[in-house]
Design a protein with these regions (language model features):
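Short coil-to-beta-strand transition motifs
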Residues: 2-8, 94-104, 206
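Flexible glycine-rich active-site/ligand-binding loops centered on an Asp-His dyad
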Residues: 119-153
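Enriched for short, Lys/Arg-rich terminal
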Residues: 215-225
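Basic/aromatic recognition patch in beta-strand/loop cores that engages polyanionic ligands
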Residues: 196-216
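Short, conserved beta-turn/loop elements at beta-strand boundaries and strand-helix junctions
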Residues: 17, 108-119, 217
């Protein structure tokens, strides 16, 4: 049980070791993820029937952003970090209860792994090690509203950049990691207020540091360490 009084039922393993580079929403980049249950919840009966669903909801904790107290307004990145709006009109991690909600693709349910049942997913917007407090099936007939208004976000995922990733550098990642990495870079991982074409950024992904610049709508990868 954590400080919020909720049981941590599992933790997710993702290619993202730090917050920089994590997609701003789930589904933007289809990076692989692996959900491992905590010991009290490693029961195959708890996931019986889950294999019939293509997507699931993850309810999780912003464990790297927990703080005492809260502010009724925040500065969302979509508005450049300058304009304040109500915290409940955003998906900011700085919330009264510090909980996140993500819909991810469920690739498979593995029942024969040493850690008990393991869920293999794609599209999570979470740092590796993030605690999960609940899992529920995604139901398209109840959970999808294609015509929903998007408020100040405009209802879209934002600009998509062109990615120039030299093949010899991309080859350092396995085939299951490459597409998610390209999508994460195309979504522009930089803070919205940073637009220095000469700056070299570093993004931790799958145990490597991807170094890149951004200029004229193109991400150019200059090194992988």
């Amino acid at each position: 049980v954590n400080g919020s009084g909720l049981d941590i039922i599992a933790r997710i393993e993702t290619p993202f070791a730090e917050k920089f580079g994590v997609p701003r929403q789930s589904g933007i980049a289809d990076s692989p993820g692996r959900i491992v249950f905590e010991k009290p919840f490693r029961d195959v009966d708890a996931v019986r029937g889950l294999e019939g669903f293509s997507h699931i909801w993850l309810i999780w904790q912003f464990d790297r952003a927990l703080r005492q107290g809260w502010s009724p307004t925040v500065r969302p990145p979509r508005l450049g970090g300058n304009e304040r709006v109500g915290v409940f009109a955003t998906r900011s991690p700085f919330r009264p209860n510090g909980l996140g909600l993500s819909a991810v693709e469920l690739e498979r349910v593995a029942l024969d792994e040493p850690e008990g049942p393991v869920l293999y997913v794609r599209g999570a917007d979470m740092v590796s090690g993030t605690p999960i407090v609940d899992i529920k099936p995604y139901l398209a007939y109840a959970d999808s509203y294609p015509d929903a208004a998007g408020g100040f976000t405009g209802g879209d995922a934002g600009a998509v950049l062109t990615v120039d990733f030299p093949p010899e550098l991309l080859a350092q990642f396995d085939s299951g990691q490459r597409h998610g990495l390209l999508r994460a870079l195309a979504a522009d991982p930089r803070p919205r207020y940073q637009d220095d074409p000469d700056r070299v950024y570093g993004m931790a992904y799958a145990g490597k540091n991807v170094r890149f610049t951004v200029q004229d709508g193109t991400v150019r990868v200059v090194g992988v360490e």
